[in-house]
């Protein structure tokens, strides 16, 4: 977990691009709060949030711990519960943590089995997405050598040779993969935003 908000502090930060950005002040956090880098939550398209029990940790610090459970929220933006020891929360600590979230989000504490199953499902989902894009890029690069040629006018493609109308080196993908990546980034960062999608296509066309 990467700490963005220290336990007991009103100062909140966001971890972006390998560094901290100051967000502002809020009521003091009852726990250390941050994110799990590289693990995305489809509920908001952002990296999974986590809370870390124990003494305050510095913003930007990387902390590892045991998965004790999670705070499940109605909007799907669940928070993993981490700690160095397996003791977990006492009833008063649990009540303070749940009270930190608005009642409309219906915060509920779940155990390590439920939390582990959720994390596993997220990783499997990411693996499928990565596999889809990897398959797209490999197939695109493999077919670049015969792009635009009518079926039956070329021998069976069995190796990565490159060439084709764009004279690409072996292993290079075409505009198909490039524009698919533009679309994926737009959907992740902006949701369904046709203007943002078109802006990215135009920027790719001009700048590559």
Residue ranges with predicted function:
Residues 1-124:
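Hydrophobic N-terminal alpha-helices or hydrophobic patches in metabolic proteins across all domains
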């Amino acid at each position: 977990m990467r700490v963005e908000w220290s336990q007991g502090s009103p100062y909140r930060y966001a971890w972006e691009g390998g560094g901290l950005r100051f967000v502002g002040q809020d009521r003091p956090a009852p726990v250390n709060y941050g994110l799990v880098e590289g693990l995305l939550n489809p509920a908001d398209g952002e990296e999974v949030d986590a809370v870390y029990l124990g003494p305050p940790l510095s913003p930007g610090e990387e902390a590892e711990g045991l998965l004790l459970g999670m705070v499940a929220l109605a909007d799907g933006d669940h928070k993993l519960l981490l700690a160095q020891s397996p003791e977990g929360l006492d009833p008063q600590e649990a009540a303070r943590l749940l009270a930190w979230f608005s009642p409309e989000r219906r915060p509920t504490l779940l155990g390590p089995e439920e939390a582990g199953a959720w994390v596993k499902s997220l990783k499997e989902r990411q693996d499928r997405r990565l596999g889809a894009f990897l398959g797209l890029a490999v197939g695109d690069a493999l077919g670049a050598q015969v792009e635009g040629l009518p079926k039956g006018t070329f021998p069976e493609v069995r190796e990565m040779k490159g060439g084709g109308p764009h004279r690409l080196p072996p292993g290079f993908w075409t505009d198909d993969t490039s524009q698919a990546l533009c679309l994926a980034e737009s959907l992740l960062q902006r949701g369904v935003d046709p203007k943002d999608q078109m802006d990215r296509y135009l920027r790719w066309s001009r700048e590559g």
